Amino acid sequence: MNDATQPHPLKNFPVSWEELHRHSKALAWRLLELGPWSGIVAVTRGGLVPAAIVARELDMRLVDTLCVASYDHQTQGRIKVLKGIAGDGEGLLIIDDLVDTGDTARVVREMLPKAHFATVYAKPAGRPLVDTFVTEVSQDTWILFPWDIEPQFAPPLASARR
């Protein structure tokens, strides 16, 4: 079964802004002693916020983007590189929010084989492709990042009885 035909995950794992900040800071702690890094590369769009937090915590100012498109809502499709990075990645720290099936990570690894690849969250299928991660979630879990959800009105429980 390929990624485009995979069934939707069975579980949702909502992540708040506070949790994402805490987990991204924990990632920075793990990366602190592994440097020094010449720069950070955020894999867009999911890696932008974690990369900003890691850059702050590691006191790094050089942040670039690797623009990759693979998801359309909850369906992973063909991977398109919209903006690459020159070189082999030596000295670079790549940051993404999540490694899922590993398809995006494989493309990134091919482009920047000497970079250190770090994600906040990792699923089992993609975990071997990253060097550092903070939180593992099961393959059948869909992570709901705070930029993908919004609060909305929920009627009181008692109103359902009327």
Task: Describe every region a protein language model picked out.
Residues M1-R162:
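PRPP-associated nucleotide enzymes
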